[in-house]
From Swiss-Prot:
The gene is Dnajc8. Suppresses polyglutamine (polyQ) aggregation of ATXN3 in neuronal cells. It comes from the Eukaryota. It comes from Mus musculus. CDD domains: DnaJ (cd06257). This is DnaJ homolog subfamily C member 8.
Length: 253
């Protein structure tokens, strides 16, 4: 049923839709193979091209429904973490490490109730967007007097549309998060540069003040020494002028 639905979608959509449907079909085929839980398939799934965005949805990483319990999440984590652990896949250790990190990150995210709620909100938003879009299209078709049947009436194609929109929302949020982090990092860097500049300016001012005071003390000492030397010379000179006149002996006849 899924295969025929996807084939029909490929024939009716544009090139972008056809590409997505082909991709989605391949993903579903991989997921079907993954149901046997082999290390090779799981590592391939978690490290395939574009995995940095595909792995943003923690439920997709662990291949579980959003409605599962925390106990089921833990059980699934144990299964996948054992399968992709680098120690068990030493012939493909680098990719195994990357896959293990993706599984570990998804598991920890779902243990955090706040982050889990955010992920659920994104999934719900994707579903509501598709439902709204389908409703508007049906309304427009009815207005035009045309049959209101749309491809999303097929449950499998509806799931595909939700999957596509959800993946898009996760990607958009990740891009915004990175932009926000880059902006915050730039702001922290700017503030740090201003702090360093202020510290250097204060240091230069302290050094200038210190040098000024030291040179001022030197100038004062030089002036005092000059005054003392000048005064001493004057006193010595005055003492020279105050010498008593020589007494001339009177000669008697």
């Amino acid at each position: 049923m899924a295969a025929s639905g996807e084939s029909g979608a490929s024939g009716g959509g544009g090139s972008t839709e056809e590409a997505f449907m082909t991709f989605y079909s391949e993903v579903k085929q991989i997921e079907k193979r993954d149901s046997v839980l082999t290390s090779k398939n799981q590592i391939e799934r978690l490290t395939r091209p574009g995995s940095s965005y595909f792995n943003l949805n923690p439920f997709e990483v662990l291949q579980i429904d959003p409605e599962v319990t925390d106990e089921e999440i833990k059980k699934r984590f144990r299964q996948l973490s054992i399968l992709v652990h680098p120690d068990k896949n030493q012939d493909d250790a680098d990719r195994a490490q990357k896959a293990f990190e993706a599984v570990d990150k998804a598991y920890k995210l779902l243990l955090d109730q706040e982050q889990k709620k955010r992920a659920l909100d994104v999934i719900q938003a994707g579903k509501e967007y598709v439902e709204h879009t389908v409703k508007e299209r049906k309304k427009q078709l009815k207005k035009e007097g045309k049959p209101t049947n749309v491809e999303e009436d097929d449950p499998e194609l509806f799931k595909q549309a939700v999957y596509k929109q959800t993946m898009k929302l996760f990607a958009e949020l990740e891009i915004k998060r990175k932009e926000r982090e880059a902006k915050e990092m730039h702001e922290r860097k700017r503030q740090r540069e201003e702090e360093i500049e202020a510290q250097e300016k204060a240091k230069r001012e302290r050094e200038w003040q210190k040098n000024f005071e030291e040179s001022r003390d030197g100038r004062v000492d030089s002036w005092r020494n000059f005054q003392a030397n000048t005064k001493g010379k004057k006193e010595k000179k005055n003492r020279t002028f105050l010498r008593p006149p020589k007494v001339k002996m009177e000669q008697r006849e």
